[in-house]
């Protein structure tokens, strides 16, 4: 299964720089508002039906007793390096999806995990239970976390019609259809509610 996925994904990834240079990709921008606004920054906007890409490696760091960033957006098949640039040992685990526990690791050590299921993964530390972050696994790399004002941009989207979805740690909004044209930015806003 993974090899057939790679046969489809690798050509798409190899074509993306050429499409980008020729102005043959578009983007999606928008704003998300939330009622209540408390959890707005725990929001990801993503394409549900975009084609997958070749796996990447991204990083989630630990500094000053915090996960950085608080939300890391990855695609199905990506590997995350969990770094420890703190002065104390940490443990990283998630009870969600394909639950995992990476064990305890000292400062300057790292662990990795490859995500094969789409969805949110709460990141916790058994040594410091007040710490919290999320890894959101999207079906493709066409996804983005919102900023503090709820704005987002999904770049390098091949032209086509898609289903745009939003995930939030506590709130919901219905999916929206979106059409992306080459060299243009499509716009889609969301209102999150309980």
Residue ranges and their predicted role:
Residues 1-10:
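Bacterial N-terminal signal peptides that target proteins for export
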Residues 9-20:
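Bacterial N-terminal signal peptides
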Residues 22-194:
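Extracytoplasmic copper-binding redox domains, predominantly the cupredoxin/blue-copper superfamily
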């Amino acid at each position: 299964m993974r090899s057939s996925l790679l046969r489809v994904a690798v050509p798409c990834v190899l074509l993306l720089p050429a499409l980008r240079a020729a102005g043959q990709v578009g983007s999606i921008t928008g704003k998300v508002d939330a009622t209540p606004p408390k959890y707005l920054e725990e929001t990801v906007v993503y394409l549900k039906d975009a084609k997958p890409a070749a796996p990447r490696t991204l990083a989630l760091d630990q500094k000053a007793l915090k996960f950085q960033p608080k939300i890391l957006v990855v695609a199905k098949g990506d590997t995350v390096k969990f770094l420890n640039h703190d002065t104390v040992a940490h443990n990283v685990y998630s009870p969600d999806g394909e639950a995992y526990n990476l064990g305890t690791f000292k400062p300057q050590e790292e662990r990795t995990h490859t995500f094969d299921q789409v969805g949110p993964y709460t990141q916790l530390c058994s040594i410091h239970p007040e710490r919290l972050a999320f890894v959101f696994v999207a079906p493709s790399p066409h996804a983005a976390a919102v900023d503090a004002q709820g704005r987002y941009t999904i770049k390098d989207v091949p032209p086509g019609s898609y289903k745009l979805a939003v995930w939030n740690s506590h709130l919901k909004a219905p999916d929206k259809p979106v059409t992306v044209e080459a060299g243009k930015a499509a716009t889609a806003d969301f209102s999150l509610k309980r």
